[in-house]
Amino acid sequence: MASYPCHQHASAFDQAARSRGHSNRRTALRPRRQQEATEVRLEQKMPTLLRVYIDGPHGMGKTTTTQLLVALGSRDDIVYVPEPMTYWQVLGASETIANIYTTQHRLDQGEISAGDAAVVMTSAQITMGMPYAVTDAVLAPHIGGEAGSSHAPPPALTLIFDRHPIAALLCYPAARYLMGSMTPQAVLAFVALIPPTLPGTNIVLGALPEDRHIDRLAKRQRPGERLDLAMLAAIRRVYGLLANTVRYLQGGGSWREDWGQLSGTAVPPQGAEPQSNAGPRPHIGDTLFTLFRAPELLAPNGDLYNVFAWALDVLAKRLRPMHVFILDYDQSPAGCRDALLQLTSGMVQTHVTTPGSIPTICDLARMFAREMGEAN
């Protein structure tokens, strides 16, 4: 084959240009990498923050346990962020919780259609989720990288939240879907709105035998709440699936690769107590993904429509980084408090991003508590 000098010269020129280009890129990257390294070193000198989200089905004893834990610390080093009851009942809408339970009851009694119930439930869940999502967004600029948990000094501040945004944007919508009062499309719409998971997101789920759970729920008094055993079973089921889903994802599970292992359409599996990270990776059929093999979400060829598949990608991305812990609530309030305190020693702290972040976060948390913490 003939050799063409012009091609040889072009090749040599291209090679030289590529070499210079690589050199220029390396030179350009050096200051950026040096800046990033400097930023990391500066961040590592910042105070640390521990964020703990106490979550799980209602009625286990989360609020009592949390308040007992907060009472152990001083006002300056531990701050409680309560559930936004005033927003739910007054600021965001009127009597949201009563509206939810009444709507479910009317659906169960055949007084309204599933479609009518879904409209009310979807609107109500938007109200339930808004305070969590916006608070997460306000805190996000102050959250730096993870500082680790082993041999870490005590954090400058511990924030104890009554629930994470996924409670209102994933778990309760999914439970209402199991109850027939929300569509799977609406559940995935909420999933798409889950904020990106911040570093150091420690979520505490609960374990409690069902009979003990029913007993505790029957004894508590919450505005607008009804004792709905079917809903209790549904939300317990969803939180069990949530714990499994995090384990599945952190164990390398891919819903896209394993989707074919789900047969037929969604059949909600029986509930089980949430499990810790120990043990083998759960099967995809024991995760939240199984709920979304629903006819409404499938194209004629049996595959998920792309828009719903993308929502499941968002779900996987949001859940994978979470640090999940399981608290045994089948003990006295003081025992629960001590067990929670023990769990915090293994939780992941984060550095804050500025010298003023800690007092700013304290102010934000206290403003939230004053404005939304209790119904007026």
Curated annotation (Swiss-Prot):
<keyword id="KW-0237">DNA synthesis</keyword>
<dbReference type="InterPro" id="IPR027417">
    <property type="entry name" value="P-loop_NTPase"/>
</dbReference>
<keyword id="KW-0418">Kinase</keyword>
<feature type="binding site">
    <location>
        <position position="101"/>
    </location>
    <ligand>
        <name>substrate</name>
    </ligand>
</feature>
<feature type="region of interest" description="Disordered">
    <location>
        <begin position="1"/>
        <end position="39"/>
    </location>
</feature>
<keyword id="KW-0547">Nucleotide-binding</keyword>
<feature type="binding site">
    <location>
        <position position="125"/>
    </location>
    <ligand>
        <name>substrate</name>
    </ligand>
</feature>
<dbReference type="GO" id="GO:0071897">
    <property type="term" value="P:DNA biosynthetic process"/>
</dbReference>
<feature type="binding site">
    <location>
        <position position="216"/>
    </location>
    <ligand>
        <name>ATP</name>
    </ligand>
</feature>
<comment type="similarity">
    <text>Belongs to the herpesviridae thymidine kinase family.</text>
</comment>
<dbReference type="Pfam" id="PF00693">
    <property type="entry name" value="Herpes_TK"/>
</dbReference>
<dbReference type="GO" id="GO:0004797">
    <property type="term" value="F:thymidine kinase activity"/>
</dbReference>
<dbReference type="InterPro" id="IPR001889">
    <property type="entry name" value="Herpes_TK"/>
</dbReference>
<feature type="active site" description="Proton acceptor">
    <location>
        <position position="83"/>
    </location>
</feature>
<dbReference type="GO" id="GO:0006230">
    <property type="term" value="P:TMP biosynthetic process"/>
</dbReference>
<comment type="function">
    <text>Catalyzes the transfer of the gamma-phospho group of ATP to thymidine to generate dTMP in the salvage pathway of pyrimidine synthesis. The dTMP serves as a substrate for DNA polymerase during viral DNA replication. Allows the virus to be reactivated and to grow in non-proliferative cells lacking a high concentration of phosphorylated nucleic acid precursors.</text>
</comment>
<comment type="subunit">
    <text>Homodimer.</text>
</comment>
<dbReference type="GO" id="GO:0005524">
    <property type="term" value="F:ATP binding"/>
</dbReference>
<feature type="binding site">
    <location>
        <position position="222"/>
    </location>
    <ligand>
        <name>substrate</name>
    </ligand>
</feature>
<keyword id="KW-0067">ATP-binding</keyword>
<feature type="compositionally biased region" description="Basic residues">
    <location>
        <begin position="19"/>
        <end position="32"/>
    </location>
</feature>
<feature type="region of interest" description="Disordered">
    <location>
        <begin position="260"/>
        <end position="280"/>
    </location>
</feature>
<keyword id="KW-0808">Transferase</keyword>
<keyword id="KW-0244">Early protein</keyword>
<feature type="binding site">
    <location>
        <begin position="56"/>
        <end position="63"/>
    </location>
    <ligand>
        <name>ATP</name>
    </ligand>
</feature>
<protein>
    <recommendedName>
        <fullName>Thymidine kinase</fullName>
        <ecNumber>2.7.1.21</ecNumber>
    </recommendedName>
</protein>
